[in-house]
Amino acid sequence: MRLAGFLMMAAAIPGLAEVSYVKDVQPIFNKVGCTSGPCHGGAKGKNGFKMSLRGYDPEFDFRAVMTDLSGRRINRTEPAQSLILLKPTMEIPHGGGVRLEQNSPYYKTILQWLSEGAAYGDPVSSQVTKLDVDPPEFFAQKPGPSQQLKVVAHYADGSSRDVTGLALYNSSIPTTAEISEDGVIKTLRKGEAAMLVRYEGRLSVINVTALSDKQGFQWKPVPEFNYIDTLVNEKMQRLHLLPSELTTDAEFLRRVSLDLTGLPPTPEEVRAFLNDKTENRKKRTAMIDKLMARPEFVNHWSVKWGDLLQVNRTKLGDKGMWAFRDWIREALAENKPYDKMVRELVTAKGSTFQNPPANFLRFTKEPKLAMETTTQLFLGVRMVCAQCHDHPFEKWTQNQYFSLAAFFAGVGTKPGSDSEEEIVFEKRDGAEVTHPKDGRVMTAKFLFGSEKSGVHEVGLRESLAEWLTSKDNPFFAQAMANRMWSYFFGHGIIDPVDDIRASNPPSNPKLLAALTKDFSDSNFDLKHLIRTIVSSRTYQLGFKPNEWNADDELNFSKALPRRLSAEELFDGVNIAAGTKVQLKELPEESKAQDFPDPHVGQGGFLDVFGRPERQTSCECERRSDVSLVQALNLLNGSTIADAIADSRGRVSKLLLGGKTDRQIVEELYLSSLNRMPETAELDYAQTYLGRGGSRAERAQDLLWALLNSNGFLFNR
């Protein structure tokens, strides 16, 4: 029976009262967990009873309650004997256990609804338009205090009511602050957490902060190099955090060299930088500019873009892979505006050889995949959850999912003259995306910002690209600013960087807003964004904690050590050891950052240390974890062992050059850790080299130890 039939039946019942399914009963089922994934909201439901996940489709759930089992879940004659009351109260066996207590407010509401005729209600007037939560934030001077939230839902008909007991609550960091089913926040330790409050498709986020109970905090003003420092310091002062000391010159040079070029500084560069008596900030700024002008800057960032754009010969063929990779390098070398890069990718047509951006559409041929990749990569929004149902933690709906996918409905591909070549073209007929529920053809529509359908005289993808890259699009500049920040600090201001949503708030909203505006105002200049970040004092802070920031990992009060990427480790080992890598398809002395795709050096050191296969555009595909296999590879793997023992390598040259023990120790420290050894380190290493036996083996042992140290393996 159609929903309209139920509404007519309910309307015919004399004395139809105020309680309705859509406004009163569905929220109860959501609250007690009936519509959760492990229960009846799962893909196949539970024990023959299927409901929509988290109640995103109340009409479906109403039909399931009313008609499944031939309507036996409700008892119109004796409402209290209805299965939907007997099972959750465990009056008869129920796999989900007790979900309702007899005579509880929830029980009484459902019983009243049944007694009054089980009306569905008016879905329009019952729609929640706004959710107010009081207080809007909670700030505790020390761990321990609690706070009861009050949640008020506002409806389309202008009414409102207290739904504190029906709202759903989650804490982003339960170890910092937890929240009860009734909306009571309890602070547990120093830190910050976001409380997520959900009710009938609406979500609100409450920020909770608990200061340390430690006494004696006093803010110490520090220099501010740009607006980043101002906004980071502002929050640190509020949270009773003190920043770590500034990096030493050697620490800064190693960090910024790796971050900008993917390569460590040479011993000669380290010595020159340490001996440069120019004013510190001016000297560092000059080094930043010098590094960004090097070809290695392009090589390094080409690796990152190659990951995101899935430059992989398995998907693109050899010629397509090389063409796409070269286009990326050229775009970075000329500092092509980011919005222009994205427009070229999204609107590409023609040969994947002659017009390399067309390769972007080659691995995203299906409209849904093209849309998901585009939104996740360029907006930081994961639409995939809205494919089967409305997004449970965001405003995106299933209708929006398929309307956005419709922009790519006309994309077609056909073979080119070469066996690996493909031609991307626009289909003339039959280009449509249909809704899986009812089969209706979806009209292309933007997610937000315009009432227009998106159909434009310049074409669907051109219209999408125009909307996507607009300065009025709040996600476009923000997503890249946040992603870029993560490359230098180990995590984004919003993290994961490609999962931007209301329920995943930024750790520093003002900072992210300022970065976003600056990037947009610069006309999406990627080099400007990078230079601004690394020129900040915040970026140049040391990794050693103080008593006030020891447990801080969110507010950028200190540098967080980051394990070198696979390519950085591989190149770092060979540079430290003075060895050269030769591969058939690459020029002599190429580095790992020159490798065009994961097939070069496949199955070896690079893959062990997390090089991605480039099967997705998710940052998560590149692993930065530390594993036992990696530890064993470092200890006795062939990559390090062969590099250290190379007869043409650094150790051999130092010995053949007649260097003293001190000179050997200093050179090995400079080439691996990119700093001079401390006095104790120098004394110990010289003693070790002078113990007798094979001096070559002892020098190799020293280099091996340095390459296995955290000072080499991490960028800190």
Regions found by a protein language model. Give the residues of each.
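Primarily short, surface-exposed interaction patches in extracytoplasmic proteins
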Residues: 220-296, 304-584, 620-621, 641-699, ...
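Sec-dependent signal peptide recognition
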Residues: 1-9
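Catalytic cores of secreted or luminal carbohydrate-active enzymes
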Residues: 100-120, 629-636, 640, 644-645
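Periplasmic/extracellular electron-transfer cofactor-ligation site
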Residues: 30-53, 112, 116-123, 382-397, ...
